[in-house]
Structures are given as structure tokens and as C-alpha cells.
Amino acid sequence: MRKLGGGHLVITDHNSTPQLMMEGFKYESLKPLLEQQDYITGVSFEKTPKNIDYNVCGFRKYWGTGTIIEMQAKELGIEPCIDKWLQIKPDLNLQGKIVCCRSTRYRNELFPWREIIDKIRDRIVFIGVHDEYGEFTRAFGKVDRFLTNNCLDIAQAIAGSDMFIGNQSSPFWMAAGLHHPLIQETCIETPDSIVRYKGANYFIDGINPLELIK
């Protein structure tokens, strides 16, 4: 959207799959973060959008042909752009911390979470919903949790931290949009959330996360 000159962003539901629907909580959580961006003049939800200049809903027909950014660029007929697209004030309370998250989808069981937690447990701050946090602590032991109200809170926490570690979840995309240092637990079956910039590291590339954590 930034590459196309910005403007008013209209969000809608592209299908009726419950976990994919944006209306309600997901939209209300995302809206404050979007409204902070200088290239977005407004944000709204519409069930049946009209008078749209660029419609990106059809990008899924390119599934399997590249990253999500590349697929969306194909749908819009433009070259992929991975320039920093998020700008927010960092939460300075997270200085020295490493923000992590792990959603229930897009996992890689070879990723050394236990070793990472054992090494930096006192610096880890988990961001995620109750079920994700509960599952994470049952698997890897107790870590601190940072409670957030919306995506703006999450992005500010990530921006204020030393690093983000997580899988292909919405917090990853916030870290990538900020060009924040990160390590991704890349899903082998669906490695479509790759954004190449200095400081972004992907497990699928054969990296050793333990060597990257300072």
C-alpha cells in the first residue's frame, strides 16, 4: 500500500471461515496500529466494499509460488517491496528483553525452543493469547508474559525489545514491518512468510538460533 501511494484502507472478510474473519475483534485490534502509519489516511471495515482502487483479496490464487509479499505483488501487478512499512514509538519498558510468541499453526518441531529458553529465560517476554501462553509454559517452563490490548501494543513492545523470536504469526509480521532483529521458527511445509533484511534470520536457512542470541 505504501508503494502504491497510500490512502484509505478498507478491510473485509474474503470468506466465511471463522478463524480467518476480520470483522470484530481482529479488525478492532489491528486498527490502532494501522492508524499510526502516515501513508494510511483512514481505516474502515466494509462487508461489501465498493469503489475500490486496488483489491488484494485474490492473491491466494498464487499460493505456493512465493512469499505472501510476492503473491500480493503479483495480484497488484507491481514489483515486491520489502521496505520498512511500520513506524511506531517503542515501549521502553521492554529494553533488554526478547519478545517471543508461538501460535498453534506454522510450527517447526526441530526449532530449539527449549535450549533457547534455558539460555535466556530471564530475558524472555511472551506475547500471545492465554491458550498459547499456557501451552508454551507447559512445554518449556515458566517465562514472563506481557499483556497487550491490541496490535499497536504488540508492535510497540517488539520495537522496544532487543529481538523478536517466534513463528509465522501476526507478531512476526509486525517485527518484519519494523525491520526489527528477529529469529523465525519457519514452518517447513509453508515457508511463505519470509522478509529479507539485515537482522532477519530464518530457521529454514539452516541457522543456529543459539549463536544469534547475544
Residue ranges and their predicted role:
Residues 1-214:
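Catalytic machinery of carbohydrate-active enzymes
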